[in-house]
Amino acid sequence: MFSKQEAQQLKKEFWTAFGKSFPRKWILYDTKIKDFSFKFSADNKKAEVSLDIEMKDELFRNAYYEKIWSLEDMLKDYVGEFSKDEFYTLENGKIISRIWVEKSGVSIFNKNTWQEIFEFFVEKMDGFERFYFDFEEWL
């Protein structure tokens, strides 16, 4: 177990190592669609790459979610199997729509799994970005 400070330091080292290992400018928040972003996340049990649709207006959020969902088979071609939740609740209680891919059995606190996480991040985020670029006009 790590102290809070040790955990923060390891997280900082993890993200720095990822950036140095795979120096690339990702789309992330620069989608040109407000509150529509791609995210990386990792904790002590898993790593995730997600598409978060965070519009406050539920009608807009649901409309974007439905557009993505209508392209489900195409998205699978880009990222493989994925999970989805139209009403995903964040830790802060905010409701968003999320589509994500997950890799379990890895930990941000285990340096031996970092390379595996980095490769997962690159493969899946690249798939999400290619999907976005190919269908951007339709979204």
Regions found by a protein language model. Give the residues of each.
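Charged, terminal alpha-helix-loop-beta segments
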Residues: M1-L139
